Amino acid sequence: MSAKRAELKKTHLSKNYKAVCLELKPEPTKTFDYKAVKQEGRFTKAGVTQDLKNELREVREELKEKMEEIKQIKDLMDKDFDKLHEFVEIMKEMQKDMDEKMDILINTQKNYKLPLRRAPKEQQELRLMGKTHREPQLRPKKMDGASGVNGAPCALHKKTMAPQKTKQGSLDPLHHCGTCCEKCLLCALKNNYNRGNIPSEASGLYKGGEEPVTTQPSVGHAVPAPKSQTEGR
């Protein structure tokens, strides 16, 4: 201010005092109402809070969307878990069925192996039963002093005559053969011998279902020896 006044004195010496006073009048100061300033501050604060609220709303909306996505994923996971649980139950049932089938197979194998182990005993029993059934039947054996074709009929004759001796005690003069020895050569020879008919050597052999032919002997009542014995001698 002093500098300005000095300059004014130098430059405006000729001017009026009033004009100088008017020029040197202090500038009016600006005054602000506190209430107005306070209201302006309120407006600025309200704008900031509004922005914050908007941001919060956006964040909430995003969170809601994320939560919905999470719920959807959870529902899918629950469905998948239910499917997995059903699959596990199905697998358990299949395992039970397989265990039951394996038990059945093991039992069948055991039952199948037991008869195989008992097979020798059963075979022995069957052999014994076969022996008992074969006892009344005829078994061919070689006779002492006979061989060839006449050997088998003689053995058959012995077998057929043995039980008759035990049962009847004495033999009939004429031997009656059953169906088992209808074509028994020895029986035919013995019957012919008892009746007085001695067959020839040709009658010792018979073919097919023909009966042996008997002829009257020329000399004595003796049974001729077979050809095999005569040749061996």
Swiss-Prot record:
Superkingdom, taxonomy of origin: Eukaryota
PANTHER family: TESTIS-EXPRESSED PROTEIN 35 (PTHR36860:SF1)
Coiled coil: 45-111
The entry's keywords: Coiled coil
GO CC terms of this entry: microtubule cytoskeleton; nucleus
Chain segments carrying region Disordered: 199-233
Protein name per its UniProtKB record: Testis-expressed protein 35
Tissue: Testis-specific.
Species whose genome carries this gene: Homo sapiens (Human)
